[in-house]
């Protein structure tokens, strides 16, 4: 034990001695060293004396090496002055290479340092505030990513396969997204803004964690069983359930609330970034660049099914985007400023949908079967709910924000509607499961029913929002805008870009089943146009 400590102390002293020798002044003589060492020897024990002797030996070796180096340099200088090519003499080359070696001596042979710290394993990028920890991780805005299929977020990277990271921290395991202020702790669990969850598929409320599977706690109290929706102050907590505006859920087919993204399959991204694979919507400032890939605001993606978020990307299929971008595949609901993009998806807040069985937004009515009319006029056929200015009048119709619904699996949001299976989110929050839309201040709670903060839905697959209705078998429209076509919903200011991809707010898409953004029309089949231009395909009513 004592010898181990002495050995460690000797190593430390030797290291310090080597450093001092390298920085030792040239003009100081060895005699002064010996005098100072002899003065200290009387104050030291036997172990210390042996250490000091070792240090003196090291210094002596260093001094000898320094003298030999000086003699070598002087000899080379004399030879260089005597040689005809003295401008490019070997001495000068030796000096320059010595300077280069000194500058790079501290660098490791295969290590690149991140802008704020080094990464720690293969294909790992470091986030702006912390590194991720496994393969297929995209790097944050301060460093590059390192492997295929990785999207880099403008301010934060994801942390493993199919995981999107929140804007300020990385996730830590598979299919887990981290909330904006803390990391999750197990598979498919997203953490709420103020605390972590504790088991699988559990989302935490803004003020406390839940305690069992598939249960989310409300901001003021927990729910008690599966498929239970929470009140206006907290989210539900089981599979396919979307979380309320103050925290994200954490399992499959769950959309995240406005403060953080989820991290596994069929998960919608939080308010600061888009999803990132096939049928993925593009971020708010640029178009996508390959099959179903959207490009982020600060750079392009690099392989298929990768989208880069403006501030953070999601990472897998069936992901809906939060309040700043649209989602891009089946059964995905979009957040408050962008629409989803496929069948049975509700559209975001600023434009109408454009195909069969789609409800129209608050600024115009739809024109086909099973479509609910917006706040300015009623619909006229079966299974249609009326907007906020009047009630519907037949079976399976939900009433507006001043009355409750009356049948299965539909929730109405305070400011936006649900729809049915894979239905859209209300104007301020996303839906969360197979057929649930989330209300403006709270989420749904079971397989097909979430009730809004001020009123319920009204029929088998349609819930009407306070200012706009849903529109067909699987599509509910948001309070001010509709969905877009068979598989694409357009964002509030821009269109999607491929077969199941919605584009972000500043660039259009270019292929089938793409909806056009608010500033220009689309040009191919099954494309819905945004709020300022007409569509032009087979199944579009505007």
From Swiss-Prot:
Tissues in which the protein is found: Cortical alveoli of immature ovaries.
Each Sequence repeat, start to end: 121-133, 134-146, 147-159, 160-172, 173-185, 186-198, 199-211, 212-224, 225-237, 238-250, 251-263, 264-276, 277-289, 290-302, 303-315, 316-328, 329-341, 342-354, 355-367, 368-380, 381-393, 394-406, 407-419, 420-432, 433-445, 446-458, 459-471, 472-484, 485-497, 498-510, 511-523, 524-536
Ranges annotated as biased composition (Polar residues): 78-95
Glycosylation sites: 124-125, 129, 137-138, 142, 150-151, 155, 163-164, 168, 176-177, 181, 189-190, 194, 202-203, 207, 215-216, 220, 228-229, 233, 241-242, 246, 254-255, 259, 267-268, 272, 280-281, 285, 293-294, 298, 306-307, 311, 319-320, 324, 332-333, 337, 345-346, 350, 358-359, 363, 371-372, 376, 384-385, 389, 397-398, 402, 410-411, 415, 423-424, 428, 436-437, 441, 449-450, 454, 462-463, 467, 475-476, 480, 488-489, 493, 501-502, 506, 514-515, 519, 527-528, 532
Signal peptide range in chain numbering: 1-21
Location of region: 32 X 13 AA tandem repeats of D-D-A-T-S-E-A-A-T-G-P-S-G: 121-536
Positions with biased composition (Basic and acidic residues): 97-106
Keywords: Glycoprotein, Repeat, Signal
Note: The core of the PSGP protein contains an average of 25 exact tandem repeats of the same glycotridecapeptide, where the Ser and the Thr residues are attachment sites of a polysialylglycan chain. Multiple genes for PSGP are transcribed into multiple mRNAs containing diverged numbers of repeating units.
Role: In response to egg activation, PSGP is discharged by exocytosis into the perivitelline space, where it undergoes rapid proteolysis into glycotridecapeptides. During fertilization and/or early development the glycotridecapeptides prevent polyspermy or are involved in the formation of a fertilization membrane.
Name of the protein in question: Polysialoglycoprotein
Originating organism: Oncorhynchus mykiss
